[in-house]
Amino acid sequence: MAAVLESLLREEVSVAAVVRWIARSTQGSEDNAGEAAALSSLRALRKEFVPFLLNFLREQSSRVLPQGPPTPAKTPGASAALPGRPGGPPRGSRGARSQLFPPTEAQSTAAEAPLARRGGRRRGPGPARERGGRGLEEGVSGESLPGAGGRRLRGSGSPSRPSLTLSDPPNLSNLEEFPPVGSVPPGPTGTKPSRRINPTPVSEERSLSKPKTCFTSPPISCVPSSQPSALDTSPWGLGLPPGCRSLQEEREMLRKERSKQLQQSPTPTCPTPELGSPLPSRTGSLTDEPADPARVSSRQRLELVALVYSSCIAENLVPNLFLELFFVFQLLTARRMVTAKDSDPELSPAVLDSLESPLFQSIHDCVFFAVQVLECHFQVLSNLDKGTLKLLAENERLLCFSPALQGRLRAAYEGSVAKVSLVMPPSTQAVSFQPETDNRANFSSDRAFHTFKKQRDVFYEVLREWEDHHEEPGWDFEKGLGSRIRAMMGQLSAACSHSHFVRLFQKQLLQMCQSPGGAGGTVLGEAPDVLSMLGADKLGRLWRLQERLMAPQSSGGPCPPPTFPGCQGFFRDFILSASSFQFNQHLMDSLSLKIQELNGLALPQHEPNDEDGESDVDWQGERKQFAVVLLSLRLLAKFLGFVAFLPYRGPEPPPTGELQDSILALRSQVPPVLDVRTLLQRGLQARRAVLTVPWLVEFLSFADHVVPLLEYYRDIFTLLLRLHRSLVLSQESEGKMCFLNKLLLLAVLGWLFQIPTVPEDLFFLEEGPSYAFEVDTVAPEHGLDNAPVVDQQLLYTCCPYIGELRKLLASWVSGSSGRSGGFMRKITPTTTTSLGAQPSQTSQGLQAQLAQAFFHNQPPSLRRTVEFVAERIGSNCVKHIKATLVADLVRQAESLLQEQLVTQGEEGGDPAQLLEILCSQLCPHGAQALALGREFCQRKSPGAVRALLPEETPAAVLSSAENIAVGLATEKACAWLSANITALIRREVKAAVSRTLRAQGPEPAARGERRGCSRACEHHAPLPSHLISEIKDVLSLAVGPRDPDEGVSPEHLEQLLGQLGQTLRCRQFLCPPAEQHLAKCSVELASLLVADQIPILGPPAQYRLERGQARRLLHMLLSLWKEDFQGPVPLQLLLSPRNVGLLADTRPREWDLLLFLLRELVEKGLMGRMEIEACLGSLHQAQWPGDFAEELATLSNLFLAEPHLPEPQLRACELVQPNRGTVLAQS
């Protein structure tokens, strides 16, 4: 494999040819003959190139001090050795991947050969983190291997080096030379666990002082040391050897002893590492300089290696995509590099070739390599959460090395809406009683029924006790609850009792542990009347603070072991403490049935023709439904795998030899608890892999070492491997899987391939032609895989370890490093002033629990009634506050504004300044709204509840319902008021200020004369709304149906026009829309006067106005139009076809009033002659009766031809032809 890499670095073969050579066995048409010949001889070793490359990069970066959890080295048979080293290991023999440190590599020269034959992962040595204590490598027996970058000793054919000896005096702080009292020295082949402590930094964030490392293999910052393979690292912590149970006490003793030594000596003491070792001392030579692209060495080599590394990642040739991204982020954020000692022998340039010289010679090389890789995977980076994108976009190293990539990341951050919350959901309430299944008819006897009810109560007592005590230090589940759980299991003798209890257990599991949105908790919602006053920005900061305090800080590195976080731990411990075969069997049956039901659930299909925006909006509900189903399936499958493989799990190492063969023969005859292979095949054929694969991964993560060797499960792993190879992220086309769906599958499959029980060489096996990745040809064209059902929130909920990328970048920003024991949480406090005494969160949580318990024991109609009352009373409370408190404040604002106007005089003031002055005085009074709202809800809610509930409701139930309704209504009302009362007061005050200032009219310079009401105006004019109603009554009486005795008096018309003048002159309550409406109504009234269509009260013979009265009213209207209306008056409506057509119904037709009105409009300058001529011309285009059209033409000619007179001399114009015999009427 080294030959391939050297050929690549010498540019004898291209990167594309190497990638094609790795990915497929046949020669591509793109490969030239020279490249094919160079690679054809190494075809048998093709599968070992990728692990060799990964281990090579780990070893080359071993001198870098990374930030955050270290990245494990890669795997199987191929080690990162150069040619001349003994051959690779056999496929069958493997070491336990779960051990924290691999066996020592150089205890003797004879130990090298057995080590090379181990099938375990080859881990390159790496530097220790610099921190207050000793490095991870301290205390390692044997000598370290010399060489630049921490490379291993070469075999035959590699240049030899002079042996180096130590001449330093003994170091009393070396735990290897001077171990703690009572410790057992490790033997070369010891199988008993060592009591010597490999010290790790003790901090509060590490649960039980476990080192924050990847569980799959040791970090790159560890050198080999002895570690017994019998030590079990199973997630439930069974089978720890007795020698390891007092690790905490020995850690405390070691820490005290070290503090004494530091107090006695002025300088820190630490073991002196062997010369040539990359281990730095406490005062070692460390460089801390900013990365500079101009100081990158071997730029061409780095670009080639980065390109082939990126190509392997893009083609899914590496087991875990996000593990490689984490490694790249480590290189990007590396701060220091261990410098070589002056006494180290330097290699001659003649000896160094392209592979022997260090790849990463400085921090500049590491950052350059990382940036080159990240540029190739921008599509993956752009789909990370918004916080990670922000940290990447603000990384100064990215800006320095690749401004283009930094700009693209910033654009992706600005356009991203993927805000991810990792807050764990809170514990929910108990499962309500199920009358359809848990009734007496479903039990064999009364005794069994009562036993079940009793055990149900015991179960919830145990659950409540666990919730109260499980976080207390020193509390143990088995000691506290184990005997009670086993006694409860002993009483469930009947099979039906087990079945009912398992159903309850499963429902409670789903209700407590299911997290559809990934975010839970109601901490911020418990005091909305206070928190909503913070504003959107500060409230968002408080949300982020809550997430940082409640979310788990670390998931155990980029490859955490399968665990049971939060409430899941209760159900795991319950199963272990129960130790009941019957319960486990019923539980497996119930879980299997529920998994098959949910996996076959019909989910909405995606329509590919939808527009992107509309599709995204429409699919929000479908995404939530899919998330609920998927998370439920993952939870159920996790517990099914845990229970199904529990009998086979143990602390002992996996069997080998004949024992393994006999176990395989025996277990191959046992049918699986669930036919997961068939379900997987159906899911792939139906294109529902995004639903099936994630829960299958959870199930397989708890398999023991023998399971992957069984033929049944071997087929499953082969299918998953081929699916992993087919999910190439760069291949996007019509009908292909959505990008985030692929990313989810790659993340869960990559995590599965790092599980210790999965064969190390499985991922790099040669693909046999016999077992093809079969997909049904009649598969649906569009399935769940093609639907955008996965978003970033679901991705991070299913794969929380992806969040380690963000934490790694955050540790770089905050300046933390390995010496701080982990990541630092930099929190900026946000404070606020409380509006009043608020109940504690504990009290509110208790009240909510009591309310839920109360409703569980009552009919559903009671809950609906109480919620209805709370909703309506809360709404009425808000309306009441608007009508009382807000209205009073608006009146105060008007009074204060008038005082301000009088004080400032005619020049007035700035409206914006006036508004701010008024709001600053009145808005603080909005705090009274909360007290008034609580009083209103307490006064109104009980009566509403009593009115709606039945009379036979018990007094205690009625009282509790009233109290709950009061609380809910108060919460709803106060939540709205606290969030909106200030804005509501500002809006109403602003409207009042605008109305008052508008009534004052425009500025004197703009209007030429005063157009508003006078200072002495008392504002007693009729309201515009009332006046509009009265004018409309007259208009409707004139044009609509009426009784013969209905009509209006001339005096009423004059009074109406007088009131119109008063309203127009006193503009206190007149707004532009009302003024426009009044103008239109006045024009309609003038049209009716001209047509003589207004019925007049009086003697039966008199139903029309006298000519003098009509002209007097028209004069009043002309005066109003001329003097009082400030807005435009639609006088063109006078000559509209509808209004002129009113004259057609008059017998005899009299046109004198219309002619008089037109001449007055011209005289007063309200309309021009050209405008009237245009209106009259448009009237000729309408369809009129013949005689009316002739009279209208005569009127037009007369108006345009005759000179204008002050008063018309004719009562009726000569508008008809003589042959029609029309009598002329003279005035």
UniProtKB/Swiss-Prot annotation:
* Membrane-crossing residue ranges in chain numbering: 312-332, 626-646
Q: Provide an example Pfam family for this protein.
A: Codanin-1_C
Q: What is this protein called?
A: Codanin-1
Biased-composition ranges for Basic and acidic residues?
128-137, 247-260
Tissues where this protein is expressed: Ubiquitously expressed. Isoform 3 is not found in erythroid cells.
Phosphoserine-modified residues are S265, S285
Tell me the subunit arrangement. Answer: Found in a cytosolic complex with ASF1A, ASF1B, IPO4 and histones H3.1 and H4.
Q: Where is the stretch described as Disordered?
A: 63-294
Annotated region Interaction with ASF1A/B: where? 188-208
Q: Which residues carry this modification: Phosphothreonine?
A: T71
Functional description taken from the UniProt entry = May act as a negative regulator of ASF1 in chromatin assembly.
Biased composition annotated in UniProt, kind: Polar residues: 214-232
Q: Which GO terms describe its biological process?
A: chromatin organization; import into nucleus; protein localization
Localization annotation: Cytoplasm; Nucleus; Membrane
Q: What is the lineage of its organism?
A: Eukaryota, Metazoa, Chordata, Craniata, Vertebrata
Q: Does the keyword Phosphoprotein apply?
A: yes
N-acetylalanine: which positions carry it? A2
